[in-house]
Amino acid sequence: MLKLKFCIVISFLILGSACSAIPSSGPSAKKVVSLGQQSEAQIPEVELIDVNHAVAQSLYKAQVNQSFTQFGDGYASTGTLNIGDVLDIMIWEAPPAVLFGGGLSSMGSGSAQQTKLPEQLVTARGTVSVPFVGDISVVGKTPGQVQEIIKGRLKKMANQPQVMVRLVQNNAANVSVIRAGNSVRMPLTAAGERVLDAVAAVGGSTANVQDTNVQLTRGNVVRTVALEDLVANPRQNILLRRGDVVTMITNPYTFTSMGAVGRTQEIGFSARGLSLSEAIGRMGGLQDRRSDARGVFVFRYTPLVELPAERQDKWIAQGYGSEAEIPTVYRVNMADAHSLFSMQRFPVKNKDVLYVSNAPLAEVQKFLSFVFSPVTSGANSINNLTN
């Protein structure tokens, strides 16, 4: 009888503190959901969104919209000259040479006198200067058209002049290609350079193809596509335009798994993307004895413009700008069979946190184990001492 009373006293002492002392790998599903139900005085606020087919499809479409085909095609260079281009001008004059008999860079070429002018930079006014001819407007003209203009003006002064004009440095129609350790300005030619030509111009990627993104900036619009998709889909390999910026990004993507899963870890995935169902598979799935299938959450910062319109209005009314990133929790109920379809469309993003809460019954079992294990151990010790 004395032993029983002693055990009961110990049980109640432990019970008083056990609720807050039970170890846990994270918050319960109820606590996570309460984040989206805070009063206005509680900051920062959190957007809580239940994942269904409509939500997953909206996020999937936003990801698919990252496509170079939206830019429309570029165009092959027409070979016309523009401000900043550098020209090489050669002039031949039949004997007897009247204008170019000597000086500058002259040499005999058979019976004709050849003169090479210093390289000519197309000025901000769009002109180049030629001796005895003066300033010539060249912007929008091809080298062939420019040489005919020079030849025509020299005919009245030189003896049977012949002219050749070459574009030696294309500074006006080019594309900037940026990669870690190697960046170039690639001139556009009449051949029509494409995105993969820009990738090749810097020697390709320094990382694995699956870990590389290609970002194209045209004006104020930026789109990013996985290099793997760019190679596999010729429609993405569009013609480039003057002023485009092609950037190669080689940082691999990662997400973090936490809670009632195999183990807490950071998991990498390719730039091509990953669905939520694939992510859960990579982290070893949910633990049968611990996890709450109704408490699967994705934590991320979501750009305001990606939220549903009615939710955007709520945040804008609170003073958030269009560039703001909103702390967002997406809740998935894996106990609902329909969620298995939604998860195949729900895209995981870089730096996401996937958290699986403990099931309520698992918490009860943990509590009972926490309470009665020391009591049982204590009772056994008393029995041993009594004996």
Swiss-Prot record:
Residues 40-53, 90-113, 142-144, 168-174 are extracellular. Keywords: Capsule biogenesis/degradation, Cell outer membrane, Ion transport, Lipoprotein, Membrane, Palmitate, Polysaccharide transport, Porin, Signal, Sugar transport, Transmembrane, Transmembrane beta strand, Transport. The keyword Ion transport applies. A lipid is attached at residue 19 (N-palmitoyl cysteine). It comes from the Bacteria. GO terms for molecular function: polysaccharide transmembrane transporter activity; porin activity. The chain crosses the membrane at residues 30-39, 54-63, 80-89, 114-123, 132-141, 145-154, 158-167, 175-184. InterPro entries: Poly_export, Poly_export_N, SLBB_dom. It is a multi-pass membrane protein. Residues 19-29, 64-79, 124-131, 155-157, 185-387 are periplasmic. One of its GO terms (biological process) is monoatomic ion transport. Residues 1-18 form the signal peptide. A lipid is attached at residue 19 (S-diacylglycerol cysteine). Involved in transport of capsular polysaccharides to the cell surface. May function as a membrane anchor for capsular polysaccharides. Possible porin properties. Belongs to the BexD/CtrA/VexA family. This is Capsule polysaccharide export outer membrane protein CtrA. It comes from Neisseria meningitidis serogroup A / serotype 4A (strain DSM 15465 / Z2491). The gene is ctrA.
